[in-house]
Amino acid sequence: IDKYFSPFISPNQKKICRTREKKDILPENNAGLYLVPQIMTNQAEMFLQTVEYLQQFGYNEVNLNLGCPAATVVSRKKGSGFLTEPKKLESFLKEIYEGTNVKISIKTRIGYESAEEFPILLSIFNQFPINELIVHPRTREDFYQNTPDMQAFSYAMDHSKNVLCYNGDIFSKEDYNHLMAQYPSLSSVMLGRGILQNPAVIASIKGEKLPEKETIQEFVTELCERYQSELYGERPVLFKMKELWHYLIQSFDADEKIAKKIKKAQKISEYEITVKELFSNYDLKI
């Protein structure tokens, strides 16, 4: 992996960065990684203040999130909700690109309700020196359902004045190869859910040794232990681990019964017994 993106920072008038968000971007917590902090706001002043704050940690590249589809986000016209106001978005981009020399990449969807919105959005993006335009070819209304709109992505490839990165539904080496066969000039691909669902996907793409079941078990165990040291109480830890297993379970030749047992676990001890059962009784299918 050449580049990582942090969970988004959502600045407000009271605080630029919450304690949890600060932990995400502290250099000592990201040793050896090229990390790009992600910012989500519709206020140019807040964006620039956050950039200035991040510079003190040595960051010279940030990312603007225009892709998040969560209802609590879009109701505030942030994330993909900002795509509904192209004129305000254009003014916002003008102000932030004039206000800093830090490299700014953008992650966007192709519209809020329809891909028909995308040509206007792309014409706005083309006015600015975007370090990297990461396109997830779904609308906000799609969330993560339906299939990526490759016609819209082809339009981006043909008309974007900025370097493009593709994001969406790369779950296997076959998915990656199919994408690159369609777009041989594409310079980069971003993985999100794909690497959670298939931890071997990058090794597979690069032709490297695939992770063994024991390696994944060690990772899952350590992750749970770290959550327990960082979070208060069992419920938030279980929430985080169940969120991961929603995707990771698909890497195993497991039945619905064991998946439900993980989902229904009410205590960490119960969760750990079930996960141990999974690793003992089911093989990887990646």
PLM regions and their residue ranges:
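Flavin-dependent oxidoreductase catalytic cores
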Residues: 1-286
